[in-house]
């Protein structure tokens, strides 16, 4: 795994765009305090232009006014409906099928934390299923979506995993790194030598 840190400031957009051309995946950092800004949308357009699968990390969630639900709504409306909260995706994916979780939710008392967990699993799968017709068919037939299919949806820029945290306080970093490893696929390149030269 090789990470390339690009300048985020608008003055270095040209240098950043050159780096985009060699990426397999991108991580777009967004301030939880400021939300989606004009430059964020510019970067998003470039990522779309170069067809780069993208993860989002919403930073500074420790600051006053950082509202997770409001930020998710903004990401969906200003960037893509495919922006989905993956913070607890590993646990979600291990939570069983929708039929399993529906039964647990019906059996559980309304005040039971397990009921909220099972509802979250259902909602997560429903959001994923809404991003692709094949995923919807799989979800309706089996009550879940295989990890490999979710990875393909991310690679095809149909789904954009979102993680939340605070780099300053080291919150959410481990969850993001684990998720990045879990939900990415190795890219196969031809054995012949090739390079891109630019000035």
Q: Language-model features: where?
A:
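Structural and coupling elements of P-loop NTPases
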Residues: 1-199
């Amino acid at each position: 795994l090789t990470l390339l840190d690009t300048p985020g400031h608008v003055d270095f957009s040209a240098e950043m765009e050159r780096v985009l051309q060699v990426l397999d995946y991108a991580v777009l950092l967004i301030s939880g305090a400021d939300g989606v800004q004009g430059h964020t949308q510019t970067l998003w357009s470039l990522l779309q232009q170069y067809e780069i699968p993208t993860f989002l990390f919403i930073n500074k969630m420790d600051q006053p006014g950082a509202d997770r639900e409001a930020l998710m709504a903004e990401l969906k409306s200003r960037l893509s409906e495919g922006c989905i909260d993956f913070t607890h995706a590993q646990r979600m994916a291990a939570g069983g099928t929708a039929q399993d979780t529906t039964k647990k939710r019906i059996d559980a008392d309304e005040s039971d934390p397990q009921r909220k967990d099972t509802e979250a699993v259902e909602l997560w799968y429903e959001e994923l299923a809404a991003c692709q017709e094949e995923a919807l068919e799989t979800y309706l037939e089996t009550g879940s979506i295989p990890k490999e299919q979710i990875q393909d949806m991310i690679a095809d820029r149909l789904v954009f995993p979102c993680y939340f945290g605070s780099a300053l306080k080291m919150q959410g970093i481990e969850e993001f790194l684990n998720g990045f490893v879990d939900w990415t696929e190795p890219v196969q390149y031809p054995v012949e030598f090739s390079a891109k030269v630019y000035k």
